[in-house]
Curated annotation (Swiss-Prot):
GO molecular function: chalcone isomerase activity
InterPro entries assigned: CFI, Chalcone_isomerase, Chalcone_isomerase_3-sand, Chalcone_isomerase_bundle_sf, Chalcone_isomerase_sf
Residues at which substrate binds: 50, 192
Family: Belongs to the chalcone isomerase family.
Name used for this protein in its record: Chalcone--flavanone isomerase 2
Function: Catalyzes the intramolecular cyclization of bicyclic chalcones into tricyclic (S)-flavanones. Responsible for the isomerization of 4,2',4',6'-tetrahydroxychalcone (also termed chalcone) into naringenin.
Length: 235
């Protein structure tokens, strides 16, 4: 039977995403849901900027399987709702963004901030508290530089917090740089990767393929036992 513990590592442009990781400052080990490249077509060439890995708590499988078991990878990758369920699900997500090309913290944080604020204002949900959180987000990245191989690490928790860490040596640090208590930002960071307009279709494809296999081989009884949690959380 396929289980999260049977998840394999992935190599994306010589960036190795291990099969499981323990996020900074956390006691839980998360499994690799999927990984892929982020790039952009520039003057006829596909330029690769980063490799992105998305890790999930083990309980994500029974929680998602209650609704998505039996779906093919193709059905999942084309479902906005499936990825929304990952973003909002009551389980931890860990996103590792590793540089292929160099990037400054200022460039990265300003782009993410502009995207978040734009969406929130369009939806009429932007608040002064959000503005204060964005200021903290920009501050933590301000003096950072990320050469090839360096990583930005995000842990999205069900309690609505976003933990941010940096790695320059390919290792996962034990301690986090900062924890921001803002559920909208926590969800927006991972949604920017795998949401409807996510920046990495390759990561979405990888997630859909691997999670489809894990869910379709998941034990029915465990799935049934987890279903009340899904409905309770409105998924």
């Amino acid at each position: 039977m396929a289980t999260p513990s049977s998840a394999t590592s992935l190599n994306v442009e010589n960036i190795v995403f291990p099969s499981s990781v323990k996020p900074p400052g956390d006691t839980n080990t998360l499994f690799l849901g999927g990984a892929g490249v982020r790039g952009m077509e520039i003057q006829g060439n596909f330029v690769k900027f980063t490799g992105i890995g998305v890790y999930l708590e083990d309980k994500a499988i029974p929680l998602l399987a209650g609704k998505w078991k039996g779906k093919t990878a193709e059905e999942l990758v084309n479902s906005v709702e499936f990825f929304r369920d990952i973003v909002t699900g009551p389980f931890k997500k860990f996103t590792q963004v590793t540089m292929i090309l160099p990037l400054t913290g200022k460039q990265y944080s300003e782009k993410v901030s502009e995207m978040c604020v734009g969406v929130w204002k369009a939806h009429g949900t932007y608040t002064d508290a959000d503005g204060a959180t964005i200021d903290k987000f920009l501050e933590v990245f301000k003096d950072e530089n990320f050469p090839p191989g360096a990583s930005i690490l995000f842990t999205t928790s069900p309690d609505g917090s976003l933990t941010i860490s940096f790695s320059k040596d390919g290792m996962i640090p034990e301690a986090a740089n900062i924890v921001l208590e803002n559920e909208k930002l926590a969800q927006a960071v991972i949604e920017s990767v795998i949401g409807k307009n996510g920046v990495s279709p390759a990561t979405k494809q990888s997630l859909a393929s691997r999670l489809s296999d894990l869910m379709n081989h998941f034990d029915e009884k465990a799935t049934t036992d987890a279903e009340p949690n899904l409905s309770k959380n409105g998924l």
